[in-house]
Swiss-Prot record:
Gibberellin A4 binds at G115, S116, Y127, S191, G320. The keyword Acetylation applies. It comes from Arabidopsis thaliana (Mouse-ear cress). The modification N-acetylalanine is found at A2. Gene3D superfamilies: alpha/beta hydrolase (3.40.50.1820). Functions as a soluble gibberellin (GA) receptor. GA is an essential hormone that regulates growth and development in plants. Binds with high affinity the biologically active gibberellin GA4, but has no affinity for the biologically inactive GAs. In response to GA, interacts with specific DELLA proteins, known as repressors of GA-induced growth, and targets them for degradation via proteasome. Seems to be required for GA signaling that controls root growth, seed germination and flower development. May function as a dominant GA receptor at low GA concentrations in germination. It comes from the Eukaryota. Keywords: Acetylation, Gibberellin signaling pathway, Hydrolase, Nucleus, Receptor. Disruption phenotype: No visible phenotype under normal growth condition. This is Gibberellin receptor GID1B.
Length: 358
């Protein structure tokens, strides 16, 4: 066993850029300490270890951010805007009454951070940096959602928080843009955040709230069956099957298995999306993520119901490749994100996915 672990470690270090390997390995080590065998979680230690950063009242690298706490739900969101779009009074305070633009369309990206429903937050340094890069590179406004985490808050708490965030964003005059004064909303997230984005989009579809598109970065899906990628990649690139199982037990309702629709959206108990106006999707799959088969099954599920889906498959990418701009996968992702959020024309559903090759 020790020899196998050493082989996996050496292979991982050979493929993954050193800075990224160190970063994600540190997360992996901390996560292992925080999870308890009885299903509980050391939240106090997690908060101590999670490096957080405040919002910045002065633009940093052309991006301004501020926090908002909803007085009704107590939900915190962090809003990132290009400094060029800020409206300030002559006293320097924010003026949140004017739209972002009355001529140009400015996409608003509602972002759900990853962490397997359990780790990180909207003000975690690593996600703060990532959201800033989204603003700078893609020319969007980002609203990062500090949703409630498991195991203290199980299904469907994170989805409910995502739904509340969507409705709050849609009601903000100062997030409107374009000649028709709309809020042009996209949902996005990585890992568990991608799962949340999908489920919020399903609810938006059911309740007639318009979302222009979904962006899912190696979304966290699964099922009872063990897939080939789970067997082949178990423990090789940062994550084990046991890790994933622990997080699903911590998030799903007590007594549920991994074929619950929250985990397996197109599984035996999943909701059919056939004939509904579900938004177009960009699904990013890392070829070294052990749950990639479930992500590809998700793409196939969208395809079979006639929905528009773009698949960006990055064969040599691992989870978290986008945290640092030290690899070609990062730049490929940003290029595709930029194109996706700026192609807001309503398109007809397509019968097959578009495979994007880096």
């Amino acid at each position: 066993m020790a020899g196998g672990n050493e082989v996996n470690l050496n292979e991982c270090k050979r493929i993954v850029p050193l800075n990224t390997w160190v970063l994600i390995s540190n997360f992996k080590l901390a996560y292992k300490v925080l999870r308890r065998p009885d299903g509980s979680f050391n939240r106090d230690l997690a908060e101590f270890l999670d490096r957080k950063v405040p919002a910045n009242s002065f633009p940093l690298d052309g991006v301004f951010s501020f926090d908002h706490v909803d007085s009704t739900t107590n939900l915190l969101t962090r809003i990132y805007q290009p400094a060029s779009l800020l409206h300030q009074t002559r006293h320097g305070t924010l003026e949140l009454t004017k739209p972002l633009s009355t001529t140009e369309i400015v996409p608003v990206l509602i972002f759900f951070h990853g962490g397997s429903f359990t780790h990180s937050s909207a003000n975690s340094a690593i996600y703060d940096t990532f959201c800033r890069r989204l603003v700078t590179i893609c020319g969007v406004v980002v609203v990062s959602v500090d949703y409630r985490r498991s195991p203290e808050h199980r299904y469907p708490c994170a989805y409910d928080d995502g739904w509340n965030a969507l409705n709050w964003v849609k009601s903000r005059v100062w997030l409107q843009s374009g000649k028709d004064s709309n809020v042009y909303v996209y949902l996005a997230g990585d890992s568990s955040g991608g799962n949340i984005a999908h489920n919020v989009a399903v609810r938006a579809t059911n309740e007639g709230v318009k979302v222009l598109g979904n962006i899912l970065l190696h979304p966290m899906f699964g099922g009872q069956e063990r897939t080939q990628s789970e067997k082949t990649l178990d423990g090789k690139y940062f994550v084990t099957i046991q890790d994933r199982d622990w997080y699903w037990r911590a998030y799903l309702p007590e007594g549920e298995d991994r074929d619950h629709p929250a985990c397996n959206p197109f599984g035996p108990r999943g909701q059919s999306l056939k004939g509904v106006n579900f938004p177009k999707s960009l699904v990013v799959v890392a070829g070294l993520d052990l749950v990639q088969d479930w992500q590809l099954a998700y793409v196939d599920g969208l395809k079979k119901t006639g929905l528009e889906v773009n698949l960006l498959y990055l064969k040599q990418a691992t989870i978290g490749f986008y945290f640092l701009p030290n690899n070609d996968h990062f730049h490929c992702l940003m290029e595709e994100l930029n194109k996706f959020v700026h192609s807001i024309e309503d398109s007809q559903s397509k019968s097959s996915p578009v495979l994007l090759t880096p």
